[in-house]
Every structure is written in structure tokens, then in C-alpha cells.
Regions:
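RNA-binding basic/glycine-rich loop and surface signature characteristic of RAMP-family CRISPR effectors
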Residues: 1-117, 123-169
Length: 169
């Protein structure tokens, strides 16, 4: 089994939802670990990369079959599932950064909330439209994917809508 390390660089605030709210303060919270630190679940990264690879089918001989081999295949019609040959761990802050943040109780500085409201055609705020979202300030996240099959030359730096980039090494 081989290990490929990856790093996600963010160029703006980001949000990976926990599905939870903070009462009247924030409608949507960022997913956090036990130390109140942000992370992105491995399954989320796997899904993002699967979708990105579907966008570049044909590049470097990338085919739908190779994507299915890497990420797995699910046929709801036949209730058939085949596990892929790559497995992703959660993307987290660098270990030294985690230690510093936890030791000095700095996790609150990683987050910024934004509030917005819907405006009608007359420039007036719509009733009950005030929303607030918690975001994470740009910090790189990293971790590993484990490959248990043979593939090469398909992972390249991927940039998504100029907000973040994933580099593999």
C-alpha cells in the first residue's frame, strides 16, 4: 500500500458544513474536531476529487472506468457497490499548528461569521431572510490518501473556481 500526501490551500474563507446551527447566532457551523479545530472529512475530499476527475475525462487517458476503479462504483438500480482502491483520511491543520493553537487556546481566531439578507426589488430586506454562516479563515489543510491499486500520472494540481487548490506529492 502506498501513501500519497496532499495539501489543500485556500485563497478565501471556506465552509464545510457540520449540519449544525448555533441557535440565533449562526445558522450554519463549520465541522470541527474535539479540539474545536476545522477539518474536512476524507469522504468529502474523495467526492470532490471524483467530481473534478469526471470534468477532465480524456486527459492523460483518464476514463470513466479508471475513475470507478479509483473511487468505487455505486449502482442504485441494481443495489451494487464496488469499493474503490483509494482511501482518504481527514484533511486537518498541520500538527505543529494544531499543537500551538490548542496549547494557547487560539481556535476562536480561525473562524469568521458572515451575515446576509435577501433584498426585494425595492431594496428592502425580505422578512425572515437574515442568515449567518460561520467560515474558516484561509489556512492550509493536509493529510494523506492511501492507494491499494496501481495508478499513475492522473493526480495533478487541481484548482477549483480559484478559491482553493489541492496539491499531491
Amino acid at each position: 500500500m502506498a501513501i500519497i500526501k496532499y495539501k489543500i490551500e485556500f485563497f478565501s474563507n471556506w465552509h464545510c458544513s457540520s449540519g449544525l446551527a448555533a441557535g440565533a447566532d449562526v445558522d450554519t457551523l463549520v465541522i470541527k474536531d474535539d479540539n474545536n479545530l476545522p477539518f474536512i472529512p476524507g469522504r468529502t475530499i474523495k467526492g470532490l476529487l471524483r467530481d473534478a476527475m469526471r470534468e477532465v475525462i480524456g486527459y492523460n487517458d483518464l476514463t470513466p472506468e479508471k475513475i470507478n476503479e479509483l473511487f468505487g462504483y455505486n449502482n442504485d438500480k441494481d443495489s451494487y457497490y464496488k469499493k474503490g482502491c483509494v482511501s482518504f483520511t481527514n484533511a486537518t491543520l498541520d500538527k505543529s499548528e494544531i499543537n500551538t493553537i490548542v496549547k494557547n487556546n487560539l481556535s476562536s481566531f480561525l473562524y469568521k461569521s458572515f451575515t446576509s439578507t435577501a433584498i426585494d426589488e425595492n431594496g428592502i430586506a425580505k422578512d425572515s431572510s437574515l442568515r449567518s454562516i460561520e467560515t474558516v479563515v484561509p489556512r492550509p489543510l493536509q493529510n494523506s490518501l492511501f492507494k491499494i491499486c496501481s495508478f499513475h500520472h492522473i493526480f495533478v494540481p487541481l484548482t477549483f473556481a480559484s478559491d482553493y487548490r489541492i496539491n499531491f506529492w
